Amino acid sequence: ENSQVKYRNLAHYPDYFPDNPGGKEGNRSMEPEPINGTQLGNDLGKLREQHPQTAFTMGPINMNFTQVEGQLLLGALPGWKTLFAKLFTKYILDLPMRLKWGWKDRRLTMGNAGVARLVLSLKDRNVDIWTETAMTDLIDENGSVIGIKALRNNSEINIKASKGVILASGGFEKDQELRDQYLPKPSKAEWSAANTYNTGDALKAALRLGADTHQMDTGWWSTVMKVPGQDKGWLSMVDKSMPGNFTVNKNGERFSNESQNYVSFVNDMFEKYAEGNPCAPCYMIFDSTFRKNRPCGPLLQASMQPDSAVPKEWWTPSFLSKGETLEELAEVAGIDKDGLLATQAKVNEYAKSGKDLDLQRGDTAYDRYYGDPSVTPNPCLAPLEKGPFYSMVLYPGEMGTAGGLVIDTHARVLNKEGNVIPGLYACGNCSTALLPTYPGPGSTLGPAMTFGYLAAKDITGANF
């Protein structure tokens, strides 16, 4: 009511543990309402591009889609072609946008829409937004935070805060030293899908003032693909849930339910890797039927991007491998041949019966959300029978770390004695996660926005 922030209900997006007591199969989470980006004026050029996997990208083309549209498009589910044609026609024929902004999409969705609406709300109140300004340290006086030190246009400046400083700087996922210190193994900054500049600077500054931390070994995990030439991991959330593939370790054996929520899958990876299971990295295996009809990460379905159009640098055992037979694929990708053949036989039987006797893939509403309802008897399982066969390497990555500064119910940062550090607040991934088990979509952004609101309320003393 008091801003341009607008969200809409996701009626069919289930909780990540929908079969647990209190779980729901939809109508809990929300996504930002799409918005016309030209409302930002020239500030549209300052808006960070969406992660390439939250848009349709091919060459210079960069067409956005919503969460609901993404389910259809990324899964190549019935109706995706009609939806794609509608969105693409509107996008490509937007000549005023092409002339002024190149290939940028006028229609902002997902995170871009959320940020754009926040920016517009600030502009409505004539609030200045400084870009290209990096906080380098906190300024404290007698134990109270009174401002920050920053680097702006290559000049060091001090910014005074008369009422308080709110840290909302993301996690420490791009700092390899902090990853080595806190996160489960294996762990590489290059596997993270997060902002390149999330190096924990605010966390380090608060630690210098004696701030307490918690849950530093947790993250918003997801398997990722390491696309050659890209500096971020490509989150694999949908691909391995679709029917017609399975994921194996170096021995060619499955080790976790591919269709379960992405955080739980990677938690399984870490736990089993620590026990000696060679499952990190792991390998998503699919055949020519899957390849023809479904995308896999940045690899579009063969009907849109045949093998001849795949960049040559992608064909590497650390990313994408191909074999005319499963035995040949095993040799190229470095997977145990006998184990892979045995797994194929098992999965093909499960696809026919509709019941995964090993890992219960397809049993829950979340599993089936990214399945294909046209595939029966199990929307998450289809046989792998027709060569050539493919392997996509998956690494244990994340979209951000989930541990950080300990805060109270007003978002005030606490020290190791449990006392408030006056003038210092935190929200988002630089603070300790409220929902570290990731019970459902929005478990990161929901608390981040809530505690940002609570921090502002405490700082201003407003009763709203």
Give a label for each model feature:
Residues 2-5:
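Hydrophobic or amphipathic alpha-helical targeting/insertion segments
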Residues 7-464:
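Residues forming the flavin
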